[in-house]
Structure formats: structure tokens, C-alpha cells
């Protein structure tokens, strides 16, 4: 509510010290001042959960499972950080000691400065990871399967001293590793999880993936830029993975086709053995379905053969993201029959 009244600034700028530090009198004063806002958003959340539970029950009844995302980090100005500052690496005044990001690489000489507060894993361990387990339990009430974003940070996370203009001076710090997941299973039982393990995997991440047994991710759009050595090529998959033509953070397949190098496109057509009359998007969908991956996921934009105008998200940008909407009229019987036939031929239909 406070941030909404000053939309051009973050909470760190808007809060006076007394409300930023959750002074009891200040909190009560703002509760009175923002009562209408608070009541409105309580109602919105109530209606969301009411409608979502109905929707999930309906699709589950059709044999459909929902896979949802959980970002590993929360925002600096999130309710989680404000209400639970002890969970994060913060100074006494609430400013971060270090923040999250990624180191410099081939794509960025200065790395990625995300700015999220980092977890105080020592404190979390001392409290038996209670907050994290409650978070995962809440996600499991929304989804049948939870995809944990940036899973590698449980093995080791990149820590950038605050303040910083870029990610050059960060360092890798050991995460909670397998102990976290062993304790999670003891506390919550078996939770269906997909680990987002895209990018360069270090030995500690590979070891954690093997220890947890969680399926990782393969993205076909990443497969065709470095020849036979590329780990995203389908012949290198294990069964315990989820293959995507692309994710919400990628361009659509047809959008990728517009910008990819000619040699990469040629290699993709050759590898996928695409006949001249097979649309490129359907060639990649076919290869995803025919792979040994246990699960194949295809964004609707790729099924419809849409271009870059239908891209869902461009990472690290603001505005214009998550605005694409599916037109129900596009869901034709012909399209359903085509997907069914492809599923049958690739052995992806249950008896």
C-alpha cells in the first residue's frame, strides 16, 4: 500500500525508518491509514484462491497436472523481506549486505546484477528451514508439480557485495545442499519438483541433482549452436528430464528462426531430419515428443507457430512482458487431432 502511493520509488526510498524497521506503533498507524487498501487486497487474494481451487479441481479431474514456478529469491521490497528480515543477509538498518546475481560470462562481460537479498542460510538451518518449507508447502497447494527457478543456488550461490554497479566483484558461496532437501522430505513428505538447471553446471550442482533425483530441464532452442558437444541435443538426454521447445524466457520457435544464425538453422533442420514441407515449429515439437525425456512441454505460441510478437518474457526488462493472451478460437479440433496423433506416434499417451 505504501509503495502504491509512490509508484515511482521502491520501498527502501518510501519507508521512513520506523515503518521500514516494523516499529509496532508505526505498523498500527499504517494499518489504520491503509485499511481500505489492505481489505481490498485481502479480498482479491481470497477470490483468487477460491477460483484457483475450483479450476485446479476441474483440470485434475480431466487428468491434467499443473506445473507452476517458484522463484528461488524474493524481492528486496517484498512482504517476505519486510516481515522476516532475519531470514536474509541484511544490516541492522535493513540494507542488504550482499545481493544475488550471476557472474560475467560469454553473454555479459559484467554479469547480471539481480539485486535480490540473499538468504541467511545459517539462520535458516538453525530454524530447521521452517520458512522455506512453509513456502514450498504453499506452492504445493497451488500446483501439482513445482519448478524451482535457479536451482543451482542450493548448491552454491553468487554473492555480490552491496552496493554494486555490476556483478564483477561477486563470489560463489556454498548453499545448503542436500541437507536442505533431506530435511524437506522428512518435514513435508514427497513433493514433485522440477529443477531449473539451465546454463553452465558446476560439479556441485550436478552432484546435487543426482542426490535429489529431481528431473532437470532441456531446451531445444539452446541445442543447435555448438555442434555435437551441446548437452541440449536430444540424443544426450536421460529419461529423468523435462524437454521444452522453449520456455517463457525464450523467444518463440518461429521468433528464434528469424534471428538465429543460418548455420544453426541448417544444423537444426539436419539434426531433426525435417522434410522440406514440415514447418520448423512442428519439427521441433516432433523431436521433443520423440525424445526419451519423461515429459515434453510445448508453449502454445510454438504450437500455433507464432513469431516474436507472441514472446512471453524478455529477462531483465520491464514493461511489455507477460501480456500475450491465447485466443480460444485458435484451439481447433484439427489442432487437437494433430497433437493427439503426434502423442500416439511418440508413445506419450497413457493407456
For every predicted segment, state its role.
Residues 1-15:
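Short, small-residue-biased leader/transition segments that mark boundaries at the very start
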Residues 32-47, 111-130, 165-173, 271-275, ...:
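The substrate-binding groove and active-site-proximal loops of carbohydrate-active enzymes
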Residues 41, 46-74:
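Conserved, well-ordered alpha-helix/loop/beta-strand core segments that scaffold catalytic motifs
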Residues 48-58, 127-214:
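Active-site neighborhood of glycoside hydrolase catalytic domains
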Residues 59, 69, 148, 193, ...:
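Conserved, mostly hydrophobic/aromatic
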Residues 81-106, 170-180, 214-224:
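Acidic, His- and aromatic-enriched active-site or binding-groove loops in soluble protein domains
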Residues 87, 191, 197-308:
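Conserved alpha/beta catalytic core and glycan-binding cleft of carbohydrate-active enzymes
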Residues 305-351:
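Structured C-terminal cap/extension of enzyme domains
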